[in-house]
Amino acid sequence: QGLNATIRAVAKTLYNQLGNDVEIIGIIDGYRGLIYGETRKMKPENFSGILTMGGTILGTSRQPFKLMRVVDENSVDKVEAMKKNYKKLGLDCLVVLGGNGTQKTANLLREEGLNVVSLPKTIDNDLWGTDKTFGFQSAVDIATNVIDCIHSTATSHGRVFIIEVMAHTLCRYCRRCGYYPYPRNSV
């Protein structure tokens, strides 16, 4: 799947290039974890068995880019908190996976002097500079498999089913899911 496969690939690459002495710190729930200092020391065995597992072993959260410079209800300046925790953890680099907002925040942190490697991850496949994002094709594959199964049930029972999939306004994912199995039957 998308996130776990990418996390595993990053970890395996680090271990292969730098040896098992490399320290990998997983940040729980993405930027929220970096803001509030919620982390987990990772070991090589943490990355075994996750290649085909959906979701993410580290969790995720929504931290809207437009609110990154807004002090929250606990008087926390999110950008300053992330910079402080980055330094406190002694990170050499922050690897982030995500869509447009994640990429904007990664660039903001880079502008603040942090070393950031940003990887494109969104089922919408709408990020500038890349043809395919992590997660797009796996999401399409899963949705089209479900559509195939439901189609056979609808046909055998003489019924019509409406299938809704998650996507952003550009809807590349929706179009791809609907087009592949039955190009004349998608709206």
Residue spans for each PLM region:
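Glycine-rich oxoanion-binding loops at beta->alpha junctions
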Residues: 36-94, 134-148
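A glycine- and small-aliphatic-rich helix-loop capping segment at beta-alpha/alpha-beta transitions
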Residues: 8-17, 41-46, 108-118, 134-138
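Residues at the starts of beta-strands that form the adenosine-phosphate
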Residues: 21-24, 92, 115
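Short, ordered loop/turn segments at secondary-structure junctions
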Residues: 27-32, 62-63, 99-102, 114, ...
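N-terminal phosphate-binding or glycine-rich loops at protein starts, especially the Walker A/P-loop
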Residues: 1-38
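Accessory alpha-helical/coil subdomains and C-terminal extensions
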Residues: 85, 96-98, 104-108, 115-116, ...
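Short glycine/serine/threonine-rich phosphate/pyrophosphate-binding segments
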Residues: 1-10, 34-35, 79-80, 93-107, ...
